[in-house]
């Protein structure tokens, strides 16, 4: 990990600081702790133009998936700190399942969807897609639909699962088939 005395291999515009958090997986308490640490760091080391980037995988596995989704869907979780939320493979599968893709629904149930549905107050063994849609707030679905694959800061590129070799970044950013997120 770089500290303030090491030279960075990339470049950010003057006054810009990036905070990046990956793979939250429904761990709301830990996310709150990380956000508090960022607030403390900004207080102790002010900077003109900070940004927070969540790198995807907000759902599945952890105990507070619905809470994490509610916090992120509500907008910038730290007042005054612009936030970018990226698409992870778990969000992609969840969204596809909620939009009626039966294969995605099956995959999702075996890769963390059970925990997600339980967090929303459902028994995944007893409920159908229509029940899922009744319990998952529309704001959470719209949040999922609005997630992007990658984000650039200076000459850094942030993505959940990496970059496809041999494909120009601009082509990847505009790529409509989000199922390629791994």
How would you label these PLM feature ranges?
Residues 153-166, 175-177:
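Acidic, glycine-rich loop-and-strand cores that form catalytic or ligand-binding grooves
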Residues 25-26, 91-92, 163-166:
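Short, solvent-exposed loop/turn segments at secondary-structure junctions
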Residues 13, 177-182:
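Acidic, His/Gly-rich catalytic cores of divalent-metal-dependent hydrolytic chemistry
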Residues 12-17, 151-157:
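Beta-strand-turn-beta hairpins that frame and shape the catalytic cleft
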Residues 1-69:
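N-terminal active-site segment of His-dependent metallophosphoesterases
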Residues 48, 61-149, 180:
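Active-site neighborhood of divalent metal-dependent phosphoester bond hydrolases
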């Amino acid at each position: 990990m770089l500290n303030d005395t090491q030279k960075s291999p990339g470049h950010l515009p003057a006054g810009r600081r990036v905070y990046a958090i990956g793979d939250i997986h429904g761990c709301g308490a830990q996310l709150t702790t990380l956000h508090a640490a960022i607030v403390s760091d900004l207080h102790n080391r002010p900077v003109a133009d900070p940004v927070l980037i969540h790198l995807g995988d907000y759902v599945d596995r952890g105990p507070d998936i619905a809470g994490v989704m509610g916090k992120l869907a509500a907008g910038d979780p730290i007042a005054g700190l612009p936030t970018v939320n990226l698409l992870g493979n778990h969000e992609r599968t969840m969204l596809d399942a909620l939009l009626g893709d039966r294969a995605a629904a099956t995959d999702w149930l075996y890769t963390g969807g059970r925990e997600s549905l339980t967090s929303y107050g459902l028994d995944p063994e007893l409920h159908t897609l229509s029940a899922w849609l009744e319990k998952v707030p529309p704001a959470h679905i719209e949040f999922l639909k609005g997630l992007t694959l990658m984000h650039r800061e200076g000459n850094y590129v942030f993505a959940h699962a990496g970059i496809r070799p041999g494909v120009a970044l601009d082509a990847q950013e505009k790529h409509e088939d989000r199922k390629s997120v791994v």
